[in-house]
Swiss-Prot record:
Pfam families: ZipA_C
Recorded name of the encoding gene: zipA
Name by which UniProt lists this protein: Cell division protein ZipA
Free-text function comment from the UniProt entry: Essential cell division protein that stabilizes the FtsZ protofilaments by cross-linking them and that serves as a cytoplasmic membrane anchor for the Z ring. Also required for the recruitment to the septal ring of downstream cell division proteins.
Binding partners and assembly: Interacts with FtsZ via their C-terminal domains.
InterPro entries attached to this UniProt entry: Cell_div_ZipA, ZipA_FtsZ-bd_C, ZipA_FtsZ-bd_C_sf
Residues spanning the signal sequence: none
GO cellular component: cell division site; plasma membrane
Organism: Azotobacter vinelandii (strain DJ / ATCC BAA-1303)
Length: 285
């Protein structure tokens, strides 16, 4: 029996449809294999990426703040920023006499305890990444110098919070760690700390939430050595900020001995910085 044109077209159509179905099945199977391979590669690479990021972050360097000038915050509620060892004890002894002796007690706003703020925050369980037993925290260099400039108000009412805040913000200081103000490399508040400003009256902190009702008789600017990479420039910025505050708010500059700060005193501070840099160069050699 001869096969007609109609039968041939049916056979050819069946073959073409079968070929299309087979090709689609083959492509689908191949794409599954590629997808699985990509997922396995991503999963395998994930721990390594986390490890690299953790190395980039690294341990942050902490900064010690003076405990003098009436600056004695509650260390149990505040983050630890102290330097360990004999240098800290020696430094505390040297700075004990920086507190101001005022004739009349002045009402100052006290910052809300950090522990109360923490209680309001949601608690999450955090996982600690196990570190090798042999790894130890990097020791920071001992603090050698504190350069302190105290600005005392000539008015009995002291420095009012809003005016004080405006002056120091214009000088580039930003509110930060330990509830005090810091001048960073960047005016945006980034980079290393050049110098800081604390309330000269206990507890030494500021409360931004109550700044409109805040007042203080004095504030303390201080620069830590070793600290900024360019201490001379940092010191000049600190002097400029202290002078600006004194001129605008009728204040008086005093040194760490509570004596009136003169041009000779500032030059003596500059010499202390030069001596420190000379010692640093000698140690490097």
């Amino acid at each position: 029996m001869e096969i007609g044109l109609r039968e041939w077209l049916i056979v050819i159509g069946i073959v073409v449809i079968g070929g299309i179905l087979f090709d689609g099945w083959r492509r689908m199977r191949g794409s599954k294999g590629k997808l699985k391979f990509k997922l396995e590669r991503k999963i395998a690479d994930a721990p390594e990426a986390v490890s690299e990021n953790s190395e980039l972050l690294g341990p942050s360097r902490s900064v010690d703040f003076p405990q003098g000038a009436g600056f004695e915050p509650d260390e149990e509620n505040l983050p630890s920023l102290s330097v360990r060892g004999p240098s800290r004890r020696r430094l505390d002894d040297e700075l004990d006499d920086l507190g101001l002796e005022l004739d009349e007690p002045v009402h100052t706003a006290v910052a809300e305890p950090v522990s109360r703020l923490r209680a309001a925050e949601p608690k999450f369980e955090s996982r600690r990444i196990e570190q090798p037993e042999h790894s130890e925290p990097r020791e920071l260099p001992p603090i050698e110098e504190y350069l302190v400039i105290i600005v005392v108000s000539r008015d009995g009412a002291g420095f009012k919070g809003p005016a004080l805040l405006q002056s120091i913000l214009e000088s580039g200081l930003r509110f930060g760690e330990k509830d005090i103000f810091h001048r960073h490399e960047s005016l945006a508040g980034n980079g290393e700390v050049l110098f800081s400003m604390a309330n000269a009256l206990k507890p030494g902190t500021f409360d931004l939430d109550d700044i409109d009702h805040f007042s203080t008789r004095a504030v303390s600017f201080f620069l830590v050595l070793p600290g900024p990479r360019h201490p001379k420039q940092a010191f000049e910025l600190m002097v400029a900020a202290a002078r600006k505050l004194a001129q605008e708010l009728n204040g008086e500059l005093k040194d760490d001995q509570r004596s009136v700060m003169t041009a000779q005193t500032i030059e003596h501070y500059r010499q202390r910085i030069a001596d420190f840099e000379r010692r640093q160069l000698t140690h490097k050699r």
